[in-house]
Structures are given as C-alpha cells and as structure tokens.
Regions:
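Short mixed-charge
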Residues: 2-28
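Long helical/loop segments within the catalytic core of UDP-sugar-dependent glycosyltransferases
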Residues: 18-28, 36, 41-43, 53, ...
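Short aromatic/hydrophobic "clamp" motif used to bind/position activated sugar donors
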Residues: 56
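Active-site acidic Asp-centered loop
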Residues: 59-61
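Conserved glycosyltransferase catalytic-site signature
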Residues: 63, 130, 150-157
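Catalytic donor/gating beta->alpha subdomain of glycosyltransferases that bind UDP-sugars
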Residues: 77-115, 147-150, 157-228, 306, ...
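Membrane-interface alpha-helices
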Residues: 177, 315-325
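Membrane-embedded multi-pass helical conduit in multi-pass membrane proteins
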Residues: 228-319
C-alpha cells in the first residue's frame, strides 16, 4: 500500500473525497491511496486501518529499501514478544555534494553508535519514521499514531514503551542489517528547516512523556535514554550557543579553544569508530577514507553552529509553531 499525503491536486477523474483509492493492482497487491491534506499521522493511521496483514511497514516516500531489508526485519516477529523492528538508515547518495557527505557521517554515527547502544540496553525511544515494521495489532491497540505532534515516530515508541512497562513487556528491536536508504536535504535552508522540526518534535515528546524522565520505574529507558534526550539532544543546543557566544570574549577564548579542540578530537574518533564498525572491506579501505572522514567531521562541526541556533529558535517558538511541518 502506498499512501500519498498532502496532495492538493488529484489526477483527472479522481473525485474529491477525503480518501480515494486511485490505483490497485491485484498482481502486486498494491493500493495507492490519496489523503487530502490531513497530515502524516492521519495518513499513517488510515494505512494501518486498511492494511490486511498482521505486520505493517512504515516507509517514507523518499526511501529505498535494500533488497533483503524487509525479510531481515520480519524474521524478528517469529518471537511473539517483538512488537516493532527498526532498521538502519543510510544516506542515499544522489548528488554527491558535500552537504550530503556531512549528513552521511552524521547518520553513520547515529545508527552505528547511539542506536546500537540504546538497543543493547533495551531502552529505545525511537524507531525512525523513515523505516519501521510493526505488528498491526499493537498499533491498533494504541490507537495508532498521535496526530497532535510533528514527532509522531518518537511519540509512538515512547507510548509503546510506557504501555509495556505498565502491562506485559514487549520488545522493540533494532536490526542494523535491515538497511534503508533515505533522501536528505540538499540545501542548507532545507536542512535547517528539517532540524527545526525535529527539535520541536523532540520537545513535544519530552513534554508529553515527562513522567518517564529519570524515573527508575521505567528502568534504563527512564534513567539513561530519557535523560540523554533531555540533557544532550534538547538542551545541548542551548549549551552550544552559549559556548559559541563566550568564544567572542577574548579572556575566555584560550580555554574554550582547548575545549573545542578536545570536542573535535572526540567527534573525529567517533566518526572513525563508526566507520570501522560499518566497513565491509579490509582495514586499508578505512585508511584510504580516513582523511575525508576527518575533513567531513570538521565541516559537520562548523555546520552545527547554524543548526544549533535554529534548534534553539525552534524551542523558543515551540508554543505557537508546535505543529508547523
């Protein structure tokens, strides 16, 4: 099933109903359904409701699955305790521009390090909306995605985790071998707009599920994952902006330069370590790409300055721009 959301002009011959079956091919079991400007959450919920099988795959329109991604994700559901499986996102290299390369390194660190760590702790708070597989019964039992947020993917997983701790424990699995290639912004403007939305979605989810933060009742999810999301992901941009402003002070410049150099070394180390985990060839391949990895990481750090500013602005304007996509 293919869902198209926010379509303003339907093809000729399609009536203006809120939900329309535009294309159906029985040979491939494909149905294409248009949802008229109701938001991503509504479109996903309609797809879940109309799905005919026990498992539902959520996939963004700009994503391409690796040939064996679905089979690798689905095998986990042989275990009845598994409620959802998230795959690994890789950047789809289209234009080979430097901005794309920077995001490639960023995604590599995110999915090869932090997602793996949280999965090992059984304390995941997010299955990316770009690619995830769920039991239909689980989604229906939770009334689907929350339509009152732009962070619907994170909110769903937090609600699932909270529900599982209250009732029977279900597993949320991260499979790094189930690979999905996703498109990324090719301009600074679009990238900043994306990160602004992500920040508002994160803030919304932490407000809605504030009871999980530092709550030992929810195990490592509350004590580690949620604290990390609050301190590093939500408040981190505030600290970064303050740090950047303090760099202007000549008296503070030497100290903060040392801190920046240390931070740069840590980031370079994380990038190389993530690449080492990711590499499928021999160690010489890693050595060959190491100069480019180091350069790209340094460029990523420079790019973080406007990104952090935009994220702080997103937090400041949260109350009147909460649902702006």
């Amino acid at each position: 099933m293919i869902l198209r959301n926010d379509i303003k002009d339907l093809p000729q011959g399609i009536d203006a109903a809120e939900r329309d079956v535009f294309y159906q091919d029985s040979d491939y079991l494909l149905r294409e359904i248009f949802i008229r400007e109701k938001g991503k959450g509504n479109a996903l919920n309609e797809g879940i409701r109309l799905a005919r099988n026990d498992l539902v795959c959520v996939l963004d329109a700009d994503c391409i699955l690796q040939e064996d991604a679905l089979s690798k994700a689905v095998k986990h559901f042989q275990n009845d305790e598994v409620a959802a499986v998230g795959g690994r996102l890789l950047v789809k290299r289209e234009d080979s521009c430097q901005l794309e390369a920077i995001q490639f390194c960023e995604y590599m660190k995110t999915f090869q390090l932090s997602r793996r760590i949280f999965a090992r702790l059984n304390a995941q708070c997010l299955i990316s909306g770009a690619f995830g597989v769920f039991r239909k019964s689980t989604l229906l039992g939770m009334n689907g995605y929350d339509i009152d947020t732009v962070g619907e993917d994170m909110e769903l997983v937090l609600r699932l985790q909270e529900q599982d701790y209250r009732q029977s424990k279900k597993q949320i699995v991260y499979d790094p071998t189930a690979v999905c290639y996703t498109g990324v912004p090719h301009s600074i403007k679009r990238l900043l707009h994306q990160r602004d939305r992500w920040q508002r979605g994160l803030m919304d989810c932490l407000i809605k599920h504030h009871n999980l933060i530092a709550n030992p009742h929810y195990g490592l999810l509350g004590l580690v994952t949620m604290c990390y999301q609050l301190v590093v992901e939500l408040l981190g941009p505030v600290f970064w902006v303050i740090y950047t402003v303090l760099l202007i002070d000549k008296n503070m410049f030497p100290l903060f330069s040392v801190v920046f150099a240390g931070y740069a070394l840590v980031q370079i180390g994380l990038t190389i370590f993530a690449a080492y985990i990711d590499i499928e060839k021999n160690k010489w391949s890693l050595l060959k790409w190491m100069p480019k990895l180091i350069l790209t990481t340094l460029e990523e750090m420079v790019l973080q300055i406007p990104i952090m500013v935009v994220r702080v602005v997103g937090m400041i304007t949260f109350h009147w721009r909460r649902l702006v996509w």
